[in-house]
């Protein structure tokens, strides 16, 4: 892309209203870019000039802006764009400001040549962002049943969990296995789960407790 005009200009920021010195390049396609230096490699921004300029004020016509410190008001330029924004610039001399005004007005009215391409906006490398997606999987909940059984020998309720085979072993005696007065209840859960399974287990546990209590109540009558 051919360069129409290039040079150093002061530019006022739109937010903080601070002046900064940049290298400006007016390209043949009707765009005005400003860079950190004259190599025009690291571009800060670019403004469309072609058919986008309403008017340009120079020098003392720029009443609503103050020049940079140590610079004359004669070098000021205010470019009013059709989109509503303004570009406040300041050249080294009044002649330089007038030359920039002439070049910008010609770029505004001159049609872009056929085959004109826009130069690269910037060669700054942006960090790459790596996106990852996580798939949702349902949680597996292991079903366990806990049974409370009254122990007549210890006089308290014990909670007995099931083993790995879904079988609950309730033993009301903690002495030697198969000793006198021992009650063994084995409760096996039906592989097909139903809402009545906890009730059935409760009934069996209650029957075992009742049998143990009954044997204790009638045991004095045998002596």
UniProtKB/Swiss-Prot annotation:
Domain of life: Eukaryota
A Pfam family matched in the record: PH
Gene Ontology BP annotations: regulation of cell differentiation
Entry GO CC: cytoplasm; membrane
UniProt domain PH: residue ranges: 2-109
Tissue specificity annotation: Highly expressed in photoreceptor cells, oligodendrocytes and throughout the myelinated parts of the central nervous system. Detected in brain, liver, kidney, spleen and trachea.
Compartment list: Membrane; Cytoplasm
Record key words, sorted: Cytoplasm, Developmental protein, Membrane
Self-association and partners: Homodimer. Interacts (via PH domain) with MYO1C. Interacts (via PH domain) with MYO7A. Binds transducins.
Descriptive protein name: Pleckstrin homology domain-containing family B member 1
Provenance organism: Rattus norvegicus (Rat)
């Amino acid at each position: 892309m051919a360069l129409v005009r290039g040079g150093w200009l002061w530019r006022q920021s739109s937010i903080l209203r601070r002046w900064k010195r940049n290298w400006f390049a007016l390209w043949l396609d009707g765009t005005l870019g400003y860079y950190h230096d004259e190599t025009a490699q690291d571009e800060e921004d670019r403004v469309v000039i072609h058919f986008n300029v309403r008017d340009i004020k120079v020098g003392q016509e720029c009443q609503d802006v103050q020049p940079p410190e140590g610079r004359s008001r004669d070098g000021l330029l205010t470019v009013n764009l059709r989109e509503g924004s303004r570009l406040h610039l300041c050249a080294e001399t009044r002649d330089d400001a007038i030359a920039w005004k002439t070049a910008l007005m010609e770029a505004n009215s001159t049609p872009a040549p056929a085959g004109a391409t826009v130069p690269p906006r910037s060669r700054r490398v942006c960090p790459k962002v790596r996106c990852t997606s996580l798939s949702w999987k349902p949680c597996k909940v292991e079903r366990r049943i806990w049974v409370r059984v009254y122990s007549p020998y210890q006089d308290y309720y014990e909670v007995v969990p099931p083993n790995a085979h879904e079988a609950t072993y309730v033993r009301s005696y903690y002495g030697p296995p198969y000793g006198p007065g021992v009650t063994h209840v084995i409760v096996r859960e039906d592989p097909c789960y139903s809402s009545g399974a906890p009730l059935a287990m409760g009934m069996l546990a209650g029957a075992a407790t009742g049998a143990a209590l009954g044997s204790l109540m009638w045991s004095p009558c045998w002596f």
